[in-house]
Amino acid sequence: MASVAWAVLKVLLLLPTQTWSPVGAGNPPDCDSPLASALPRSSFSSSSELSSSHGPGFSRLNRRDGAGGWTPLVSNKYQWLQIDLGERMEVTAVATQGGYGSSDWVTSYLLMFSDGGRNWKQYRREESIWGFPGNTNADSVVHYRLQPPFEARFLRFLPLAWNPRGRIGMRIEVYGCAYKSEVVYFDGQSALLYTLDKKPLKPIRDVISLKFKAMQSNGILLHREGQHGNHITLELIKGKLVFFLNSGNAKLPSTIAPVTLTLGSLLDDQHWHSVLIELLDTQVNFTVDKHTHHFQAKGDSSNLDLNFEISFGGILSPGRSRAFTRKSFHGCLENLYYNGVDVTELAKKHKPQILMMGNVSFSCPQPQTVPVTFLSSRSYLALPGNSGEDKVSVTFQFRTWNRAGHLLFGELQRGSGSFVLFLKDGKLKLSLFQAGQSPRNVTAGAGLNDGQWHSVSFSAKWSHMNVVVDDDTAVQPLVAVLIDSGDTYYFGGCLGNSSGSGCKSPLGGFQGCLRLITIGDKAVDPILVQQGALGSFRDLQIDSCGITDRCLPSYCEHGGECSQSWDTFSCDCLGTGYTGETCHSSLYEQSCEAHKHRGNPSGLYYIDADGSGPLGPFLVYCNMTADSAWTVVRHGGPDAVTLRGAPSGHPLSAVSFAYAAGAGQLRAAVNLAERCEQRLALRCGTARRPDSRDGTPLSWWVGRTNETHTSWGGSLPDAQKCTCGLEGNCIDSQYYCNCDAGQNEWTSDTIVLSQKEHLPVTQIVMTDTGQPHSEADYTLGPLLCRGDKSFWNSASFNTETSYLHFPAFHGELTADVCFFFKTTVSSGVFMENLGITDFIRIELRAPTEVTFSFDVGNGPCEVTVQSPTPFNDNQWHHVRAERNVKGASLQVDQLPQKMQPAPADGHVRLQLNSQLFIGGTATRQRGFLGCIRSLQLNGVALDLEERATVTPGVEPGCAGHCSTYGHLCRNGGRCREKRRGVTCDCAFSAYDGPFCSNEISAYFATGSSMTYHFQEHYTLSENSSSLVSSLHRDVTLTREMITLSFRTTRTPSLLLYVSSFYEEYLSVILANNGSLQIRYKLDRHQNPDAFTFDFKNMADGQLHQVKINREEAVVMVEVNQSAKKQVILSSGTEFNAVKSLILGKVLEAAGADPDTRRAATSGFTGCLSAVRFGCAAPLKAALRPSGPSRVTVRGHVAPMARCAAGAASGSPARELAPRLAGGAGRSGPVDEGEPLVNADRRDSAVIGGVIAVEIFILLCITAIAIRIYQQRKLRKENESKVSKKEEC
């Protein structure tokens, strides 16, 4: 809200400041005197009495006269004991006792109060609890202090439960003090105008307070108006109090929108409600009863042109005529104070500051209507009808929250029919049933379950029936027939099927309030019903409307929308980003680190940095790397800012940078991260800062806390140094930034801002000295934050008596606890926090059970999750427990969530006062042995490691994460432990990326090839074949796993060719018809085994996956993760002396069959990805080299992002990286066929000869050694023919 709005409010409330408080309106702070003990017996009354000696006059506390207390004639829930205090008093406490020397006492009761003995209101504890705790014997006294106190003349005690072996018996006392009350009554056509002191004083504090009792649901309570439409108004609208603040004429353009605040509900219940408006400096507090709304008014206190008048009860039209421009207030105001001035007293004394319009009086009339509350779906009220009349006519008013329910049923005379009036979907429906005719239905009204009073009039006579709901009339014509009124009408429900009445309520009974019931032309007096003189009833509360607004205050968090019925409320969390009964639990992970360990790849994600805290989720980019996860928050500022010379002292540029997240969200994300940084790239040409030597900063930046910073990069605060200045390598040593040198050439500074407490940058200001040709530009990068400090924050508990302690957990209305644990023990307490009687505890109760137990005053409650597998398996398990006003829930890992609803109208506040114990209990028993990690309470992370460093028996950190997160490493990747987390080692995988899940793909042009060498490259003569055979004897395979994916439209194609020094080979080809063919030749003296797999034409331009798994002679082939086929080899079981693997065109396929040679000559044109042969990943070795290369590339081979996402087969993708032509990872031309290693060429024949001789001698020696080794090994192989599987 802008300054004008604040000034309006300030001036409107302007009066000399006085020391004043609402208590000072008439009540001393010491208010606990006994009020009932001195009253005469006539001040006590009751529903009934067992005898004259058990009458209500004997119910004073600690008295023994009479029979020693009050006992009713019948002990049931419709009995009551009433006290008349003689005048309105402030009541602060009550006390109860049983009947003296008897077995008669009350164990729980309701307390109700009233001003005039009618229209009773129930006192509720903690805004929801109905009953008060009573006695457990006849003589002990139970006191209960009322918070908050209330003002009343009449009190009623209604027993709810009593000693089952006795009767109801009560002695009572009421404590409090006198209450000062100044009342003014407005009849809906009157008002009071108060003229303020016109002295131009500016008080520090402005206060207006009052109480009101409304007879109608709408009306103006107070109004103040200026000459240009400025005004404040306090208005009752549909039982809610609305505070309007308008700072200007609505007809004129204004940038200041009117402020509207709404508080309270059901305020038209004809009971007193308090209002307090406070203005302290710029802070405005608006309070209705116990509910306060705070808001900060912006601007100063400059005065506007306002009238020094304020009206109460209505808004007078110009000229002070008696005409009112809006609905005026009908009801009473009490103790009306304006900055400590008693306005009512001024009016009663006819002071000149007061002008009264209309019928204003100084006493408050008591309500005349008698409401009836239908407490349950079993409630009903049976009233006699006007038997024999030729019409049916009923009127009444009702209010409810329920969308459906039975309102009225009646039978017509002589069994001629019946009618039923009911609510369905918030609409009123009437159905008339007549013998021999189809039912007649009428619908009227809509949204009638809004808690407001609605008037209903129903009549049926001869040829028509009509229903009027408020102003909505519905008429239904009838066949002319005589309609005779029946004997009994059933309101709210039916007596029961056994009554023989024929009454049915298929939609359930009505829960709500009724009043002003008339049958025919006769008004019904519910007091006669209460006394048993009229009709009958069940589960009613007469002379009281017990409706409550369960959405005030709303327990729905994070913007969830509250809706309610009579018994409960519910929260609609759609679109909030939260879930749960009260929209408390976030749907999103807390950080990119948490997203990563869910197995999510890089991308856009919502994160909720404070979990279930008040800050909402926001969108970020998560960059998943092998070591960590980076959170990237981009700003909405310009990509680049260009600066040119300007007059000296004038800013060249002051650019602000806004972010999609709010300041609080950014602060939470930055605080959560291990490290944050933001890069500034600055380029400058002929720009300089000659005045920087005297310490005057010519450029600065503003962080999230709106503080100005002149330090750049990693420099110390206010050092005015760039990174080059710290490192001492600036281009001009007399300056601390390259761009300060003012060179006549373009220079640059790359600055990394890494002071986490100030990030992100919200503004950058650049100035210059006015050089006409100075020029510069800069680019601010996104905010980058690495990791999550809380995600791996952990502690190891080594003894059962060890624990960590923290301050008490404050989660009165909502408490959620989430953490990870791992253990090998069968039981132990994870956390415990105690109060005087309340407590909360989470424990591993058994190897397969986790239990969440607590007590908020309704008795201990437990929620248990049972698992089919043990939790003590030394793997991480995630626990999330939540307790709120709706109930409790517990979830462990992905097991079904267990829930326990809260009792209706029970205690809701969890009150804890001891220390919070983690890993143990206060008694040092049942302690937890194991690790606890990432512990959060209501979204706030606890630093376990910090506490563990100073706690005996507890160590910071936990080892062994791969047992839980190892599954994230896919496609052959291996999990490696880190101090804080895990990383995936993709060295032996055909994939890379943080989870070894990013496929490595390449486009092969026509005629290109890629060769992977399993052995060092040697050039040997044909005569040395036997020597080579011995040399490569160790590379013998009896099994191999092969995977590849491809996309092509060419046939025939060679997908993969593996050769051997023994002329053995394996080929995977696409035949001319596109079928997949596999050939194994494992014995050079036999023909190859050839297998054709007619799954489909696989040269269709689509991506296909092939997986081949050989175990000796058994080969299993799987295509596209679905089609499978098994074949048996006949040519052998050992693949000896494996030489190389070739993708694409094969120049020489010695000993290959004709089909393989044709495919080898054609090669492969298209995309290959994720190629793996055992531990060898040729594409990865070429495109992601990490050591000496074993790969030779010929022709055009270019990397692709993904085969499935690339261009069509036969053409390379546009986004490809630079192609690999004749080499991988090398610059300059490379001869075709050269291995991708840094081998020196030797052209000297002499040196070559010497080397050849040396190699020959060496090979001979090696062959002899190998032969001896083979002879020894042969004996073992003869004993066991089991082949050893190749391991990576």
Curated annotation (Swiss-Prot):
GO-annotated cellular components: membrane
Highest taxon, organism lineage: Eukaryota
Region (Disordered): 23-61, 1215-1236
Misc. remarks from the entry: The gene encoding CNTNAP3B is the result of a pericentromeric duplication of the genomic region encoding CNTNAP3 on chromosome 9.
Database matches in InterPro entries: ConA-like_dom_sf (IPR013320), EGF-like_dom (IPR000742), FA58C (IPR000421), Fibrinogen-like_C (IPR036056), Fibrinogen_a/b/g_C_dom (IPR002181), Galactose-bd-like_sf (IPR008979), Laminin_G (IPR001791), Neurexin-related_CASP (IPR050372)
Annotated glycan sites: N359, N706
Domain EGF-like: 547-584, 959-997
Mode of membrane association: Single-pass type I membrane protein
Localization per record: Membrane
Annotated signal peptide: 1-25
Residue ranges constituting the F5/8 type C domain according to the UniProt record: 31-177
UniProt-recorded name of the protein: Contactin-associated protein-like 3B
Entry's transmembrane regions: 1246-1266
Aminoacyl-tRNA synthetase among keywords: no
Family designation: Belongs to the neurexin family.
Cytoplasmic side: 1267-1288
The entry's keywords: Cell adhesion, Disulfide bond, EGF-like domain, Glycoprotein, Membrane, Repeat, Signal, Transmembrane, Transmembrane helix
BP term (GO), one: cell adhesion
Fibrinogen C-terminal domain sequence ranges: 585-792
Laminin G-like domain span: 183-364, 370-545, 793-958, 1016-1203
